[in-house]
Amino acid sequence: MPMSLGNAFIKNFLGKAPDWYKLAIISFLIINPFVFFLVDPFVAGWLLVVEFIFTLAMALKCYPLQPGGLLAIQAVAIGMTKPEMVYHELQANLPVLLLLVFMVAGIYFMKELLLFIFTKILLGIQSKILLSVAFCVAAAFLSAFLDALTVIAVVISVAVGFYSIYHKVASGKGTTSAHDHTHDEEISELTRDDLENYRAFLRSLLMHAGVGTALGGVMTMVGEPQNLVIAKQAGWEFGEFIIRMLPVTLPVFFCGILTCALVEKFKVFGYGAELPNNVRQILVEFDNKERANRTKQDVAKLWVQSAIAVWLIVGLALHVAEVGLIGLSVIILATAFTGVIEEHSMGKAFEEALPFTALLAVFFAVVAVIIDQALFKPVIDAVLHVEDKGAQLALFYVANGILSMVSDNVFVGTVYINEVKTALVEGVITRDQFDLLAVAINTGTNLPSVATPNGQAAFLFLLTSALAPLIRLSYGRMVIMALPYTIVLALVGLAGIVFFVEPMTAWFYDAGWIIHRTGEVVAPVISGGH
């Protein structure tokens, strides 16, 4: 029986997404205006946040850009926020958008070097525990100087490379032939178990690396975008920022690494999968074949990419330009000196990042609603009016942590530092208390936010990447795998805030490592973004 036009419209709406999912999105779109106009705009704002989180959680059913975008368009249309506010959020977050467009594409042109290095690491370290710790520490070290998104882009690029090599051979093809690694139809039953184990192995390495970016990112002022905002507000330089964070970040780092080793040893929370022997054999053969077939031109490419990698790390660590612009320089240098000059060859590099860039723009529309409807105001006001200084530090950390799990952690950090800055200007708190609160805000936004992909842009990027469905990494699985880290990082961080930060900071003052700041302040900034 031929399909009616009405049915065709319904069939086309959100494509292959399940019918219940389509129904859920339609119901959200019907309910939201009623709640906004007839119940309470504040309630409608929180409802929108929950609905947006739902679209992220269902990322494997339907990419969140379409359903999330429809919700955001409606929110602007009914007046929950204004187009100008969304544009302002995008302006404030231009560095992040540039980072995604250019840096992720730049990493694409360095994948030969990355695959070369990581193949050596993967095949050289036999112990899964040591390998996991190596990934976690490497990601932490890189994230202290580079942006976490850049580090995750590197790891994703490497993982896709490893996955496609094995998938190609398991489908009965050679390592050099063309192959679509998104389809499993050609995989035989014998190799299917290996494939599942390999997926679990890659999932665990990616999650260790993801958490590593949080462990390293919290330590320095260039590690995460909100750190930069907080450092600017407090007037701290690179070295002072590291020292002030140490009472919290050092114990958290060591406990994070210990957690990495323990979850692997006891094979809990989805960790512990070993690299299957058949897969190792295929990767060894691939490595040998690559080495045997490497021409002088290939070697020259590796040298060029190594030089560009040095420029990338130095440029980012010294902050010689905005991250996105350094990414653009990487694209130009890498393509010019490795001979990639056709437009269609360059286009592939942008495929990974642009859908996520669009999704992030939608995310900032939701952040605009959070600001306009003052959704976090009750929490912030309650914490600021606590009299006991020690309790206030702990509460700031906890409140930041909880809000960072559901919202953009840069937004949360920026809102809090502005409120604290205002309190300092009005004489509600002393400058020393302001400095301690800045530490609580920075660690509170960075550490507990590993709980969900909403909190960490790097996790969100991983969840919505082309790699996530290949290795079966869903929102729920990500939350479960992050759980041991969430508990350890959040609690050790809290212990650092409660027990270590005040006495250690006093000791740093006495030792002359840092100086007592006077009341000088920078004008409060408006929301920033990832």
UniProtKB/Swiss-Prot annotation:
Annotated protein name in UniProt: Na(+)/H(+) antiporter NhaB
GO molecular function terms listed in the Swiss-Prot or TrEMBL record: sodium:proton antiporter activity
Function: Na(+)/H(+) antiporter that extrudes sodium in exchange for external protons.
Recorded catalytic activity of this chain's protein: 2 Na(+)(in) + 3 H(+)(out) = 2 Na(+)(out) + 3 H(+)(in)
Cell compartments where the protein resides: Cell inner membrane
UniProt xrefs under InterPro entries: Na+/H+_antiporter_NhaB
Membrane topology qualifier: Multi-pass membrane protein
A Pfam family the protein falls into: NhaB
GO cellular component, one term: plasma membrane
Family: Belongs to the NhaB Na(+)/H(+) (TC 2.A.34) antiporter family.
TM spans (from-to): 13-33, 98-118, 123-145, 149-166, 205-225, 238-258, 308-328, 330-350, 356-376, 393-413, 451-471, 480-500
Claim: Thylakoid is one of the keywords in the record: no
Record keywords, A-Z: Antiport, Cell inner membrane, Cell membrane, Ion transport, Membrane, Sodium, Sodium transport, Transmembrane, Transmembrane helix, Transport
Major localisation: membrane
